[in-house]
Amino acid sequence: MEKRYYIAYGSNLNVHQMRMRCPSARRIGTSALKGYALLFKGSKTGSYLTVEKKPGSSVPVGVWEVTQADEKALDRYEGFPNFYYKKELTLPIKGIRTGKVRKRRVFVYIMHEYSPIGVPS
């Protein structure tokens, strides 16, 4: 079973919510998404958190190891590919158990750039 690393911000940092959405997901560490900032964007029905490129900024993220089934559940939750798209990155991940830093290939959900800026809903 192939596992991938997912970087989370916002509601997907909530351990209880992630357990409900992705029962096999495992917290493995933390990192920072450098050169990005958090902001709310959305649609007529509401605004949601996303990340967007912004030089000099940084977003702290949690890192989850997810199975293919977990990733499919996240795709549904995030409205992929219509509302959010996935971006692949390589980031240094600080392990929860060991504190060691290792570079890992990760994916993150980012709202499409054409979505208007909004306020939390």
Give the residues covered by each predicted segment.
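Glycine-aromatic micro-motifs
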Residues: 1-121
